[in-house]
Amino acid sequence: NPGKGHGNEYYLPEGYQDPDDCLAMARRAKDKGMQIEFTFAYSDTWSDGENQLIPYDWRPYIEGNNLTGDELATYLEGKIYEFTKDMMLKLIEQGTCPEYVSIGNEMQYGLLYNNHKKNNGFYNKSGYLTRFVNAGARAVRETSPESKIVLHSDHGGELLSRRKAFIN
């Protein structure tokens, strides 16, 4: 979780699943001899198929520059890449490189679209989803080529129902 904004009723309290907490959890897991599957949710709140809220700390630039459409997508693509790369480097530096990395959490038909009923134009737009997932994947591959990249669909048992979301 990149920042600390309030998005919905499921708000993560200060210090819970923030970067420092995630690094500490990774250290505990490795100390116990466990493999790590690290999920990048890119949200201050629980992200799921209904809600993919843009992190609070990323919003001032968006709002201050009235970003929409491709400009907004380009900005978010850069933030996803930067945040993913930064966290991966921190994990590697402390000796907890994850074996598996999930780009996004419980994705339905998009990533960072806010809410599917009142969205910013990224819901059900496979081109944007592809750009965002590729930005995170590129950061993982550059920092840890041995880590396996996974995607977490909200309908894992019915993956074909989400197939169109990943077709560009």
Which residues does each predicted region cover?
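Substrate-binding cleft and catalytic face of glycoside hydrolase catalytic domains
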Residues: 1-125, 130-148, 152-154
